[in-house]
């Protein structure tokens, strides 16, 4: 500041004679100092203001660099799309539950508005602290007997059946629990196009066609209302970046397609396990949440799960509800074991599952084995 005053005083536009005069007059000297200060003060203020602006600009630029450098998950606020494929080719067979495809979408957190809000409050007992989502899905499943060469009915084997459906679901989640209620509705029978899909795929890959689709279950609209609850419990905290948890679950399904109660648990080992509740599957299998939290890094976990089901109705085994059709003697209890691997990077998740399902009807020779693959992406 003093340097600025001296510079301003030395350059002020005042006659030298005036300074000689001012030196002999105190009042004039005060006036000269005032004029010099008046000239110097704005210049000093301008220099100080420029310095402050440069400092603020530098801070903003540095903050911008830090924000840019900080890894941000690209799908943190997006919905989740998932494509599921399940097939017994992974078990080396072509029988019973032989193929399933499903495309699903689960929304980001959606609040308590719309149709899902009242459903979540009334049926899932959700409140404003819960994270509520809704989901839509379409899918198709196919079932065939063990002998796919025969054209005649095979009363001791799984009936031919196709199932095409749509699904609406609502989810309510807090930190460590997930509740879901959903409705599947669709068509069983020729209109589900199971024969067309299976035989065209077999022709495309050069394998034998299934010859007995004329004996499949008749067209019948069907539905099932489903409820599931899952809880996450951490067994071992983070050690070397890894965790161990267990996700027990219970469920109930009621409808013309399927009526059952189920319970089971999944054990998981890996990193950042709070990203989801397990891998997505096609029901009636024990599935995960259908969505996950995006992460800017690579994550993975191994899992093994088991479930028991008490089954009161299975249309694919019991046959058509109002028409005579093929059927088998259904077993009232079914067990399922699954294990696999889930990998995630940013907004992508890939899961592989191998499944062993116990005998579902009396004439079934052995438990069924099949594989499941799912690809999920958030956008």
Language-model regions: role of each:
Residues 67-78, 109-132, 173-180, 233-246, ...:
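Short loop/turn motifs that connect adjacent beta-strands in outer-membrane beta-barrel proteins
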Residues 152-156, 209-215, 251, 323-327, ...:
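Extracellular loop and loop/strand-boundary signature of outer-membrane beta-barrel proteins
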Residues 146-150, 266-379:
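Outer membrane beta-barrel transmembrane domains
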Residues 40-41:
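N-terminal signal peptide c-region/cleavage motif recognized by signal peptidases
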Residues 105-107, 140, 170-172, 229-233, ...:
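Residue-level signature of outer-membrane beta-barrel architecture
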Residues 81-87, 134-142, 183-189, 229, ...:
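Transmembrane beta-barrel strands of outer-membrane/channel proteins
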Residues 95-101, 160-164, 179, 219-225, ...:
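Residues that define the transmembrane beta-barrel architecture of outer-membrane proteins
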Residues 122-196:
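Long, hydrophobic/aromatic-enriched structural stretches that serve as scaffold segments
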